Swiss-Prot record:
SUPFAM superfamilies: LuxS/MPP-like metallohydrolase
Function as written in the Swiss-Prot or TrEMBL entry: Involved in the synthesis of autoinducer 2 (AI-2) which is secreted by bacteria and is used to communicate both the cell density and the metabolic potential of the environment. The regulation of gene expression in response to changes in cell density is called quorum sensing. Catalyzes the transformation of S-ribosylhomocysteine (RHC) to homocysteine (HC) and 4,5-dihydroxy-2,3-pentadione (DPD).
Reactions it catalyzes: S-(5-deoxy-D-ribos-5-yl)-L-homocysteine = (S)-4,5-dihydroxypentane-2,3-dione + L-homocysteine
Top-tier EC class: lyase
Record-listed Fe cation binding positions: H55, H59, C122
Name this protein carries in UniProt: S-ribosylhomocysteine lyase
Entry's cofactor comment: Binds 1 Fe cation per subunit.
Source organism of the structure: Helicobacter pylori (strain J99 / ATCC 700824) (Campylobacter pylori J99)
Length: 152
């Protein structure tokens, strides 16, 4: 039975992480286009990101990616802790998205601190690790050639 949530219709046993895939496209009544990407770091049901590393990578990418692309709406973690969703507005160039993600991950490796990792700006400020986030980014970058190979 087809479900309302796109990712619930994805056969998670047939994908091969890491990958970047278009998860959804929506056209607004005024013609705006919203594209949601599934940016998968870990193999579903086999591995996951630990929460401090995921949380820190969320902060780093959410801040840094906007230096490379003004059409980014959101970068948010998946509850299963295997990846993130990247949502963009009025932009439909998959190759450019891969390039932006690559530049962003390279910048994550150069970061000296996790942005907004304090009690004033974050709801769980004690739950961060720059080293963990950089390890995730490095592992993702190491498999750059595989990002477009989803496996489904």
């Amino acid at each position: 039975m087809k479900m309302n949530v796109e990712s619930f219709n994805l056969d998670h046993t047939k994908v091969k992480a890491p990958y970047v895939r278009i998860a959804d496209r929506k056209k607004g009544v005024n013609g705006d286009l919203i594209v949601k990407y599934d940016v998968r770091f870990k193999q579903p049901n086999r591995d996951h990101m630990d929460m401090p590393s995921l949380h820190s990578l969320e902060h780093l990418v959410a801040e840094i990616i906007r230096n490379h692309a003004n059409y980014v709406v959101d970068w948010s973690p998946m509850g299963c802790q295997t990846g993130f969703y990247l949502t963009v507005l009025n932009h439909d160039n998959y190759t450019e998205i891969l390039e932006v993600l690559e530049k962003t991950m390279q910048d994550v490796l150069k970061a000296k601190e996790v942005p907004a990792s304090n009690e004033k700006q974050c709801g769980w400020a004690a739950n961060h690790t720059l080293e963990g986030a950089q390890n995730l980014a490095r592992a993702f970058l190491d498999k750059r050639a595989e990002w477009s190979e989803v496996g489904v």
